[in-house]
């Protein structure tokens, strides 16, 4: 029997109802056919499925369209290369699916893909494919992305971590297809909390899959392997005095830019609780850094490398994608109480106009309406963020076998 999915939401608050209804309608515009397969693209001018957004986006949308949610996982798994590398994006041109390997483009995949296993009814074949995909990708990372042998995985281009135009990358290339690092750059290959977290999240999910299979020996194996990655992050990238992680350049020098990537690491669950507590209390909630009028700029607003650029730029403005990832990041470490604060900020920033864009001014909360080649709307991470924050605050959400009820007051 085919699984049936649907979501219903009603509230007496006119703004919230309008936001949810509009997000529902505009999300449907991002449903596309890729070679006869229904997928949810990123939208807002981004016509592909990217590894940094669309497995996570597909999992969030699976409650409304399970077929698209599943395909947003499978197209990455089915197009994994023989050497274990997963495509950073998948395009469709003239009906043909084209996996692209010129960047990692983030990795919001393992936890989302595992959750889809539960949403689809626990298909063992899907679980086997996910296990194999993650095991092979983790092996690829450690075989290729520790080019100097210091035990810390590296990012080689801006798009590896999805940080378009980020100043902290210096003269690094935007993308990179080769299996050896670029030469002659000032910063890369860069020891990276993001890429290390790719490995941690893969290994943690492999441990969870092993538990589902009742393979306790493998579960302990992967838990120990994940702990090794977490330990290296703590000893090599974490600064106990500063209470934050910092990447290192090709000469192992600490790059002191205070970045939101610490929150990304929390999304991948690669911080210890103590590390997360320090970053949240010392930096995330600091109004001089990340807890601005519109919270979550990509770089702390008092950092020398912050730029309040209104077009796609990860050196500054608050990104809808960061809001989307922040939900899991905060839930992982018990900071659920911050989710309604962020949700309310996002609802008010989008407002009655219901234009869903990529970036927001951290000082005024004004949406940056122009991106790529013109005015932007229907940006998937903004649409799905509205739907997910509403579910967390006033509805229900599903995490593996558990149903959570939102009980925030104010919009009954």
Which functions belong to the PLM regions below?
Residues 3-33, 46-48, 142-158, 198-278, ...:
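Catalytic cores of carbohydrate-active enzymes
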Residues 4-6, 10-22, 63-64, 81-83, ...:
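Active-site acid/base region of carbohydrate-active enzymes
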Residues 11, 49, 99-105, 109-119, ...:
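C-terminal capping/lid segments that line or modulate ligand- or cofactor-binding pockets
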Residues 21-32, 66, 75-82, 109, ...:
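Glycine-rich, acidic and aromatic/proline-enriched surface loops and short helix-turn segments
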Residues 38-43:
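Active-site flanking loop/helix segments enriched in acidic
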Residues 48-73, 78-166, 196, 316-333, ...:
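Aromatic-rich carbohydrate-recognition surfaces in CAZymes
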Residues 78-89, 136-140, 231-235, 285-296, ...:
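Short, mixed-charge aromatic SLiMs
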Residues 88-108, 139-224, 254-256, 261, ...:
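The feature captures the catalytic groove of carbohydrate-active enzymes
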